[in-house]
Regions:
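Short, acidic Gly/Pro/Ser/Thr-rich loop/turn segments
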Residues: 13, 24-26, 120, 142-144, ...
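Active-site beta-loop-alpha junctions enriched in small/polar residues
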Residues: 22-24, 86, 196
């Protein structure tokens, strides 16, 4: 996957500004009434996967940079724009890669603007932290007609989820930040189960019927933990 960085140097020494947007998108999902990658314009709006999150932000950055250069050709510092991959799956091959290679070091960039879609008229000076993790339970496979011969990993995962509901979620909801975070729900620590998979894998083309009649010997969840600055 590609990463691009464009930089325009000013005429004098100053503090560079970097606009960063991610160019990857999540899965298209179902229920589209337009081609998700067609970019159809209707009633002044563009419809397509990623138009909001966040190709619109990238386009706005380019337009803003062009307008600034037209109005202030004799500016100090530099203007940078980057488009990075991998944001939707962790950022390790995108922003983290650029950071590791020194692209955001203080001698190169003093200000970073990320035009993520956070509703209108909302400017943020930071963001909650994130930690993604996997939990996997194991059991013993058996035929579905004789589950007593097996040990269901899905039932074990059910116990994990029940404990999260009983103990972990109330604990996290009790953690509150003193910062002016918006929306209100984001003032607490949060945890989401992003996905759960168990049993025999579905065909690559998607679910077409009942899965294999087996006791699941493995079950896996991916959790998404968001941290407050106080944590």
């Amino acid at each position: 996957r590609w990463i691009f960085v464009a930089r325009y140097e000013g005429n004098r020494t100053g503090e560079p500004v970097h606009f960063n947007s991610h160019i990857d998108v999540v899965e298209t999902g179902h229920g589209w009434t337009t081609d998700p990658f067609g970019g159809e314009v209707r009633d002044g709006r563009v419809y397509g996967r990623g138009t909001c999150d966040m190709k619109g932000g990238l386009a706005a950055s380019i337009v803003a940079a062009e307008a600034f250069l037209d109005l202030c050709p004799d500016f100090a510092g530099a203007v940078e724009i980057s488009g990075t991959a991998d944001e939707e799956s962790g950022g390790y091959g995108g922003v983290a890669y650029l950071a590791e290679k020194g692209w955001f070091s203080p001698d190169r960039v003093q200000h970073v603007i990320i035009p993520e879609p956070l509703n209108k008229d909302r400017i943020c000076l930071g963001h909650r932290g994130v930690w993604w993790a996997e939990i996997e339970t194991h059991g013993r496979i058996a035929h579905g007609s004789m589950p007593f011969l097996g040990d269901s990993a899905i039932r074990h995962m059910g116990a994990v989820l029940e404990e999260m509901e009983r103990v972990l979620y109330p604990l996290l909801e009790g953690k509150r930040t003193a910062m002016p975070v918006v929306p209100e729900g984001a003032r607490s620590s949060t945890l989401n189960v992003n996905s759960i998979h168990g049993g025999e894998p579905e065909p690559e083309e998607g679910f077409t019927g009942f899965p294999s009649p087996c006791v699941a010997d493995r079950c896996r969840i991916v959790i998404d933990r968001r941290f407050l600055i106080e944590e």
